[in-house]
UniProtKB/Swiss-Prot annotation:
Cross-link (Tryptophyl-tyrosyl-methioninium (Tyr-Met) (with W-96)), chain numbering: 219-245
Named cofactor requirement(s): heme b
Comment on bound cofactor: Binds 1 heme b (iron(II)-protoporphyrin IX) group per dimer.
Stretch list, region Disordered: 1-25
Binding site for heme b: 260
EC identifiers of the protein: 1.11.1.21
Catalyzed reactions per annotation: H2O2 + AH2 = A + 2 H2O; 2 H2O2 = O2 + 2 H2O
The protein, known as: Catalase-peroxidase
Location in chain, cross-link Tryptophyl-tyrosyl-methioninium (Trp-Tyr) (with M-245): 96-219
Record organism: Chlorobium chlorochromatii (strain CaD3)
Length: 733
């Protein structure tokens, strides 16, 4: 064998990637994936430990970078010439596609992390040639360095593109911090090939949490469902996918029409002329993809979507000409040079009315995509589109607001917004929380309130369950939910099944009475919000439960939360935060295609928990008797409401043998191996901590005789983390 082919370390022969050794996942594809709990660690982040992006962004000269971006718009480069001499339309598409992956169901996707730089997004078919847009931006990113993230730069560039073409934008907020590795937690679908659509079932029911019709698309197929040019069918897909990213019909029409006011699509030749996407391209391409062998491979010969559409007479100027053309012509089905379905005016009308992108001597007829015509032929969309057509100022305002929502929806509350262009107007989708309006309670008041709470009729389990219900709605994906605002007492959260509404109401009444009496007794301006009191009640209960175990502990508590009102709460928007499963409370609303173990990991990831943090919280919550519905599944202790390590000790006990008691193998009995006596019952969430080898290793740490104190410390630390996940006023971002 040629010695040069052997690895200098192991002596093993190098093999093509397809022949490399099999991974654990290859051998056991159903193995629980805990890796998503350990993403984006300091090990992959090149920034210094004390790097604070919010502080760096404050140093950014926003006016200066915007001037540089305006100049870039018309600085056409030979290696990737600008259509119409203006990169604005390309940059709008880049920003749109950065933000447009967001979906409301789990809050994942969106522009908040700069993930368009990494797989799979950097290689999605719908993102073809956006690699060039980011390369065009590199000199500006290089100039301003760490003062602006790629995530912020892509959105700011989209704003500058719009402004440079005549639109007054609604505003811009910075504060998006970059990630440094691909996001592995996002479920994009099961399809194994681009543009497949196995995500549908029944009468075209789109699988949740997905918000795109095909693998590798941002929203919909512009040619129509599965490439069938049916505008009405396309309208159904549009309405479903845009709704799943929090857009109503008015916002949807504004975004489509506004976005298609600019630029063109690219389908100069057959797609077979285009090379592989960035992640599959050769090393010499240096991260670029879609190398085009047709003609010059750029400019007039560009191939991206395969469609060759110019919508308006002024592709680099804001106008309502999109509507003028949409309603001004009758349309017939044609095909692009690449063979994609599109529409042109009947009878040759409209010829020579729109400019060529690269040859000033040439003119063309306008064209539309099937999804564009949906705005004319769907009755509800058509009414809105005509209103915008007849009221250009209303259209401009609607687009500016919808664009701001599109590009900022996943940033969370306004307290995370940074920069001089943050809009003054508060919008209900921002989950507004009132500004602090009172003096904060201090150590003496905190101690007195704890004593009052513990002296009330409320149990340890009730107090801890209520605090968890309030805080654990948080999703790090879009920074929504959490204890701040006390929205637990408002619709829809107060009525969620997992929160046991009747019991919750009793708990809240007791806490509200304590709050009212305390605030009325003060003449020094100090008050306590219900949001703070809910969390404080949980902290006090944990201290009491630890004392029952023989340990005196102090659970950290930082006041400063405020109470939102029902008027500040969009019940429909908050409905997506309802847990369909919460393994920490042993709750499952219904049967789902995902296992409850997978749903636990998903919940933990949204709460930013590591595997050890998840493990210690599960063990603590079980012995504290906080299961939804007061079930005893997983309560492996003879002394409930005592914060002990009993869950771990008893789970590891070889004297217990487990057997499924339900047909679905989701409920189990644990019996004494010798006598057969029933000892415990459990769910899959409970038993996975003994079954999964990695989780069992963690359980063993907490199941040792010398681990009680470590268990308490780790549980309190993880609890405090969850209680403060939405305290951006404390964390800076």
């Amino acid at each position: 064998m040629n010695e040069e082919r052997k690895c200098p370390i192991t002596g093993a022969t190098h093999k093509p990637s397809a022949e490399k050794g099999r991974s654990n996942h290859d051998w056991w594809p159903n193995q629980l994936n805990l890796k998503i709990l350990h993403q984006h660690s300091a090990l992959s982040n090149p920034m210094d430990k004390d790097f604070n992006y919010a502080e760096e962004f404050k140093k950014l000269d926003l006016a200066a970078i915007k001037q540089d971006l305006y100049a870039l718009m018309t600085d056409s480069q030979e290696w990737w010439p600008a259509d119409y001499g203006h990169y604005g339309p390309l940059f709008i598409r880049m920003a749109w596609h950065s933000a447009g992956t967001y979906r409301t169901s789990d809050g994942r996707g969106g522009a908040g992390t700069g993930s368009q730089r990494f797989a799979p997004l950097n290689s999605w078919p719908d993102n073809a040639n956006l690699d060039k847009a980011r390369r065009l931006l590199w000199p500006i990113k290089q100039k301003y360095g760490r003062q602006i993230s790629w995530a912020d730069l892509m959105i700011l560039t989209g704003n500058c593109a719009l402004e440079s073409m005549g639109l007054k934008t609604f505003g811009f907020a910075g504060g998006r911090e970059d990630i440094w590795e691909p996001e592995e937690d996002i479920y994009w679908g099961t399809e194994g090939e681009w543009l497949a659509d196995k995500r549908y079932s029944g009468e075209r029911e789109l699988e949740k949490p997905l918000a795109a019709v095909q693998m590798g698309l941002i929203y919909v197929n512009p040619e129509g469902p599965n490439g069938k040019p049916d505008p009405l069918a396309a309208a159904k897909d549009i309405r479903e996918t845009f709704a799943r990213m929090a857009m109503n019909d008015e916002e949807t029409v504004a975004l489509i029409a506004g976005g298609h006011t600019f630029g063109k699509t690219h389908g100069a030749g057959d797609a077979s002329q285009v090379g592989p996407e960035p992640e599959a391209a050769g090393i010499e391409e240096q991260g670029l993809g879609w190398k085009n062998q047709y003609g010059t491979g750029k400019g007039k010969d560009t191939i991206t979507s395969g469609l060759e559409v110019i919508w308006t007479t002024t592709p680099t100027k804001w106008s309502n000409n999109f509507f003028w053309n949409l309603f001004g012509y009758e349309w017939e089905l044609t095909k692009s040079p690449a063979g994609a379905y599109q529409w042109t005016p009947k009878y040759g009308v409209g010829a020579n009315t729109v400019p060529d992108a690269h040859d000033p001597s040439k003119r063309h007829a306008p064209a539309m995509m099937t999804t564009d015509l949906a705005l004319r032929f769907d009755p509800d969309y058509e009414k809105i589109a005509r209103r915008y057509y007849e009221n250009p100022d209303q259209f401009a305002d609607a687009f500016a607001r919808a664009w701001f929502k599109l590009t900022h929806r996943d940033m969370g509350p306004r307290s995370r917004y940074r920069g001089a262009e943050v809009p003054v107007e508060e919008l209900i989708w921002q989950d507004t929380i009132p500004a602090l309006d009172h003096e904060l309670i201090g150590a003496d008041e905190i101690a007195a309130l704890k004593a009052t709470i513990l002296a009330s009729e409320l149990s340890i389990a009730q107090l801890i369950s209520t605090a968890w219900a309030s805080a654990a709605t948080f999703r790090n994906s879009d920074k929504r939910g959490g204890a701040n605002g006390a929205r637990l007492r408002l619709a829809p959260q107060k009525d969620w099944e997992v929160n046991q509404p009747d019991e919750l109401q009793k708990v809240l009444q007791v806490l509200e009475t304590i709050q009212t009496e305390f605030n009325a007794s003060r003449n020094d301006g100090k008050k306590v919000s219900l949001a703070d009191l809910i969390v404080l009640g949980g902290c006090a209960a944990i201290e009491a439960a630890a004392e029952k175990a023989g340990y005196k502990v102090t659970v950290p508590f930082t006041p400063g939360r405020m109470d939102a009102t029902q008027e500040e709460t969009d019940a429909h928007s908050f409905a997506v935060l309802e847990p369909v499963a919460d393994g920490f409370r042993n709750y499952l609303k219904a049967k789902y295609s995902f296992s409850v173990e997978e749903m636990l990991i998903d919940k933990a990831q949204l709460l930013t928990l590591t595997a050890p943090e998840m493990t210690v919280l599960i063990g603590g919550m079980r012995v504290l008797n906080t299961n939804a519905g007061h079930t005893t599944h997983g309560v492996f202790t003879k002394r409930p409401e005592t914060l002990s390590n009993d869950f771990f000790v008893n789970l590891l006990d070889m004297g217990t043998v487990w057997k499924a008691t339900s047909e679905a193998s989701d409920i189990f009995e644990g019996r004494n191996r010798s006598t057969g006596e029933l000892q415990w019952t459990a769910t899959r969430v409970d038993l996975v901590f003994g079954s999964n080898s990695q989780l069992r290793a963690l359980v063993e740490v907490y199941g040792c005789k010398d681990s009680q104190e470590k268990f308490l410390n780790d549980f309190i630390a993880a609890w405090n983390k969850v209680m403060n996940l939405d305290r951006f006023d404390l964390s800076g971002l």
